Structures are given as C-alpha cells and as structure tokens.
Swiss-Prot record:
This is Biotin synthase. Homodimer. Signal peptide: none annotated. Pfam families: BATS, Radical_SAM. SMART domains: BATS (SM00876), Elp3 (SM00729). Its cofactor is [4Fe-4S] cluster; [2Fe-2S] cluster. It comes from Corynebacterium efficiens (strain DSM 44549 / YS-314 / AJ 12310 / JCM 11189 / NBRC 100395). [4Fe-4S] cluster binds at C70, C74, C77. Catalyzes the conversion of dethiobiotin (DTB) to biotin by the insertion of a sulfur atom into dethiobiotin via a radical-based mechanism. [2Fe-2S] cluster binds at C113, C205, R275. It catalyses: (4R,5S)-dethiobiotin + (sulfur carrier)-SH + 2 reduced [2Fe-2S]-[ferredoxin] + 2 S-adenosyl-L-methionine = (sulfur carrier)-H + biotin + 2 5'-deoxyadenosine + 2 L-methionine + 2 oxidized [2Fe-2S]-[ferredoxin].
C-alpha cells in the first residue's frame, strides 16, 4: 500500500505547485490509493484543474457521419464489420450534419465532432467531410473537429485547410496492452497520425477506454504515453460492453477505480483538457459524474454517443449549473 500522505504531498508540490505531471511510478501509487483517500485525491485534482486550466467546462456534441461496417477489429467496438453486432452501416448527408451541429450549438456547446467508422478516409469520405465542414461553418457558430481514422500527410493537410481545428484519434490504451485490444493495425500507426496532425497545426485530441482488462501499471503507462503527445484534449471513456463484440462479457469498471483513474490522469496532465466521454453513466452514475467534474474533469460530451445512449443533454446541463461550473464560451475570430 502506498504512503498516502507522501504521494499526495508530492503531487501537491510537483503538480499543483509547479505544473509538472507525475511520472509512471508515481501514477501507480495514485492508482493504488485506498478508497478512503479518494476524496482527498479528487480535491487535489480539482485544485490542479482550476489552477492550470481554469474554471470553465467545454461542452461538445458528436455525430457519426458513417456508422458501422468498419474493417478493423477493435474488440470493444460494435461498429466493426467483423463481429456479430446489431450495428449496421449508415451514412448521413450534409443537411443532417448541419442540423445536428445547430442542435448541438443550442445546448451551449462550442465543439462539434464529426466521426466516421473507418480505418482511414477514402476520397468520397474526404470530399463529404470537407463539404460538411464548410456548410457547418457557414451556418453554425461552433468549432468543428473530426475523427475519421488514420490519415496520410495529404489528408491531414486537406482537413487543416478545410477548417478542422481539432482532430481526434484515440490511442485507446497503453502500448503494451494494445495487441490484446486490436490486431488489424498497430499502436504505432495511431501515434504516427497524431504526429502528422500536430505538425499540421491542428489541435491533438487523443484518449481511450479504461476498464478493458488493463492492469493498473498499464493504466499508468497509458496516462504517461498520452501526456507525451502534449494533447489539447484527452477524452476518457469507460468500457460499456457491447453485444456481439469480443469484450461483450467484460465486467464494468468499479466506480472507485474510475475516480482514481480520473485523478491520476489529471495529475499526469495538469494543463490538458480532460473530457468525460462514453460509459460514464454506467460506470459512475450521476453521483460519480459529479465527483469527476469536481475531481479533475473539465470537458464533457453531452447527448448520445456513437452507438450508445448518454444522459439527456438537459440533465447534464442542469448538473453543471447546480455545481456552479461555468461553460466555455466560443472564442470569436474577427
């Protein structure tokens, strides 16, 4: 068992005081904290977030431009065409994307992310994405992000020129655990796309899914590997086992473990936006979600996710209002 006072005191001086994230061995200590120390961890993580990121919460909506039929075998994902999943391939048109962006903006969101279930975009998808970004920017006061898989240098340039300001490509899990989650591509391929995105001047968004069977050591490894990306945003998902996938029978992550992970990720990345994403409703519930927002989280996806239901948007907005958490206002470009 870790020396609780020692590791939290170290984090208080190193992270809160100096803005330097914890290393892997220190994060392992955080992830092994006893349950009774979770409130102290959450309070410290909240202080770190307020000092280094500010008090605002960024709200985002996401939509799937192309759902299902993906050729990859990510074991957690019901959009893979390789598994006996109920999800079937569906494409949205430009008008539907614009309308979804308008509805997202009405919630107070400043970010709208267009997602496609593909290994990487072909010319048809790239053209449609460019058209969608242009249409949304004409009609909606919102930033547009994208997540359409692995990219070539030419595709990265096209998206940056189209006005995509942030690109999501999740590392998903620790490098050492990745082969147990995906076999049709490598962790290094994902990392290379993120390098290209950063070089093109787009903001890097990369996170993953916790509770897939990784060890605490691998969870700490993952946090450090994400920190090395210097990402603008890290979305944290918790496994929501999907019928028909290889991980369908995996148990849900314990809520206490999820809170420890949130605290650890904040202490690893004091300057990074850390976003609540899929699975929080099942893993944490309403009370745990509130603890997370007061324990290091400073961004949230509202509404539904790609293939799973989220909480009603109004419930999340009411929760943030009750907790007196101000929403980020979209910065105007003049």
């Amino acid at each position: 068992m870790p020396n609780t006072t020692s590791i939290l005191d170290t984090a208080r001086h190193q992270v809160l005081g100096d803005g330097i994230g914890l290393d892997q061995s220190q994060l392992i200590e955080i992830l092994n904290l006893p349950d009774e120390d979770i409130p102290a961890l959450m309070e410290l993580a909240h202080q770190v977030r307020l000092k280094w990121c500010g008090e605002e919460i960024e709200v985002e909506g996401i939509i799937s431009l192309k759902t299902g039929g993906c050729p990859e075998d990510c074991h957690f994902c019901s959009q893979s065409g390789l598994f006996e999943s109920p999800v079937r391939s569906v494409w949205l048109d430009i008008e539907q994307l614009v309308e979804a962006a308008k509805q997202t903006a009405k919630s107070g969101a400043t970010e709208f992310c267009i997602v496609a279930a593909v290994k990487g975009p072909d010319d048809k998808l790239m053209n449609q994405l460019e058209e969608a970004v242009a249409a949304i920017q004409r009609e909606v006061d919102i930033e547009v992000a994208a997540s359409v898989g692995s990219l070539t240098p030419e595709q990265v340039t096209r998206l940056a020129r189209a006005g995509v300001h942030r690109y999501n490509h999740n590392l998903e899990t620790a490098r050492s655990f990745f082969p147990q989650v995906v076999t049709t591509h490598t962790w290094e391929e994902r990392r290379e796309t993120l390098r290209l995105v950063a070089e093109a001047g787009m903001e890097v968004c990369s996170g993953g899914i916790l509770g897939m069977g990784e060890t605490l050591e691998q969870r700490a490894e993952f946090a450090v590997q994400l920190a090395e990306l210097n990402p603008t945003e890290v979305p944290i998902n918790f496994l929501d086992p999907r019928p028909g996938t290889p991980f369908a029978d995996r148990p849900l992550m314990e809520s206490e473990d999820a809170l420890r992970a949130i605290g650890a990720f904040r202490l690893a990345m004091p300057h990074t936006m850390i976003r609540f994403a899929g699975g929080r409703e099942l893993t944490l519930g309403a009370e745990g979600s509130e603890q997370g927002l007061l324990g290091g989280i400073n961004a949230i996806i509202v509404g539904n996710y790609l293939t799973t239901l989220g909480r009603p948007m109004e419930d999340d907005l009411e929760m943030m209002d009750r907790l007196q958490l101000p929403l980020k206002v979209l910065n105007k470009v003049i």
